Each structure stands twice: as C-alpha cells, then as structure tokens.
C-alpha cells in the first residue's frame, strides 16, 4: 500500500512539473507587424506615409522591442518600446524603394520580423539635351532612367524607330540606357528620343545631336617656328639700322669755332 501511495505521489509531482513548464514551452514569443507574423513586402508610392506597428504575441512578461532601418537602429521614445512599438515612414520617395525595416526582441534579437518597402513610380529620365560633335568623332547619348517596376526602353530618331547601323551600339543597365555612335556622319544629325514604357506610364526624353563639318587640321609647330623667324629678323633689322644711324651721326660731328663780329 505504501509503495502504491509513493508511486502516486511521484506521478502527481511529474504532472505538476509538466503543468508548470507547459506555458514556457507553448507560449514562445512571436512578433507581428501590422497583424502579419511573416516577413512581407509593403507596396507604397512616393509622397505617402506608412505606419508599421510591431507587437509581441504569446508573451508571459513585458518585452522590449527594437526597430532597425537597414542596419541603423531607430531611436524610440520610452513609451514606444514595451510589447508594442510603432514607427511612421513619412514623405516616402523613390529612394526609399527596397528599404528594409526590422523589428526585434531586445532580449533575443534572433526573434525578428522584417518589412521591405516596394515604392512604385513612373520612369524618371534625365540626360544632356544637346550635343555637338565633329564629323568622324564618337558620341554617347546617355539616358539616365529610374523606374519601378522596370521599364522597357527604346531609342527613336526623328519620331521613328531607330534603325541600328554598324556604327550604332546600345547598352542598358538598371540605371541608364545608352546609345553609342562611332565616327558620326552628317546623316546622324537629328533628334533622338529615349522612350521608357512601364506598367504605370510611358515617358520620353529628347536628345538633339548636331554634327559639324570636320575642321581642317593646321600644324601648330611650323606656325610657331615661322613666327620666331619673323621676330628674330625684325630684331636684327632694328639693331642693324640703329648702328648705321649712329655711324652717320659721328661723321657729321666736327670741331666747332666761335666767330666774333
């Protein structure tokens, strides 16, 4: 009987320990941002303001939260740290596209959740509007482009699709769309249009190319040498003339006498 009672007591102790430790096992803290418990992408636009609210779920004690913008820690007020914390992203611009905001538990920073800003905007085009080139030289028309989503790019010439010739070359990156023309000809004169077509809007920027006649090449060295010869000739001529004048003056000078009348 005593053995049965002892075994029953041990079982009760075991069950009691399981009950005590169960909340710690089942209620591990989970973070959410704006109600989402997984990392996500937030679609937004320039000029808008977005609010991100991070909250601790299943916590059994007060938890301090941290916010990071990329690798930089966000300065939070004292009343905006415990169990829930909000940050406002105001004045969103095109440069904020791809920026990551991360909320972390202070005591265990491996517990975190991130939000990536997806700032959508129409194409922004820029570049040198006017270029003048000498016939036979090389020219680069660089159309700087910024767009999200990425735009489809094309070159037009004088309002028509550009017919690429052997001396034309196109290069495209995520930041620019470039047309290179080697040994430009008179026929390359005209207005070149950089066209960006995105799902939001189509934008155009014009580049005006003026090809001048090839100037005659004048050798500079012979001109300099001729100028030096002329200068030295003039100098020697002046010196020789001065010596001749001085000789004539000496011949004209003789003994002077005073005559009293």
From Swiss-Prot:
Record's bilayer topology term: Single-pass type I membrane protein
Modifications made to the protein after synthesis: N-glycosylated.
Subcellular location: Cell membrane; Cytoplasm
One of the Pfam families matching this protein, by short name: I-set
Extracellular side stretches: 28-219
Stretches assigned to the Cytoplasmic side: 241-261
Superkingdom of this protein's organism: Eukaryota
Entry-linked CDD domains: Ig
Domain Ig-like C2-type: residue ranges: 28-114, 122-208
Cellular component GO terms, alphabetical: cytoplasm; neuron projection; plasma membrane
Disulfide bonds: 54-103, 143-194
Glycosylated position list: 83, 108, 118, 189
Entry keywords, A to Z: Cell membrane, Cytoplasm, Disulfide bond, Glycoprotein, Immunoglobulin domain, Membrane, Repeat, Signal, Transmembrane, Transmembrane helix
PROSITE patterns listed in its UniProt record: IG_LIKE
Subunit structure: Homodimer.
Name the UniProt record assigns to this protein: Transmembrane and immunoglobulin domain-containing protein 1
């Amino acid at each position: 009987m005593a053995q049965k009672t002892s075994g029953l007591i041990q079982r009760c102790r075991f069950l009691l320990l399981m009950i005590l430790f169960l909340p710690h096992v089942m209620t591990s803290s989970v973070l959410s941002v704006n109600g989402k418990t997984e990392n996500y992408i937030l679609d937004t636009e320039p000029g808008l303001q977005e609010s991100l609210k991070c909250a601790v779920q299943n916590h059994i004690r007060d938890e301090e939260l941290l916010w990071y913008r990329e690798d930089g820690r966000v300065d939070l007020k004292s009343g905006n740290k415990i169990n829930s914390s909000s940050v406002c992203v105001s004045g969103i611009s095109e440069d904020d596209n791809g920026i990551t905001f991360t909320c972390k538990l202070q005591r265990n920073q491996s517990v975190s959740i991130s939000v990536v800003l997806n700032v959508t905007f129409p194409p922004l085009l820029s570049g040198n509007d006017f270029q003048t080139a000498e016939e036979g030289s090389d020219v680069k028309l660089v159309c700087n482009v910024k767009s999200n989503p990425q735009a489809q790019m094309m070159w037009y010439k004088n309002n028509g699709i550009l017919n690429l010739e052997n001396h034309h070359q196109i290069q495209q990156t995520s930041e620019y769309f470039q047309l290179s023309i080697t040994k430009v000809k008179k026929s390359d004169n005209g207005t070149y249009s950089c066209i960006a077509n995105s799902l939001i809007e189509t934008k155009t920027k014009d580049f005006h190319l003026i090809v001048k006649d090839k100037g005659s090449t004048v050798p500079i060295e012979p001109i300099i040498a001729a100028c030096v010869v002329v200068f030295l000739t003039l100098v020697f001529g002046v010196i020789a003339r001065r010596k001749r004048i001085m000789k004539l003056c000496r011949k004209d000078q003789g003994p002077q006498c005073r005559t009293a009348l």
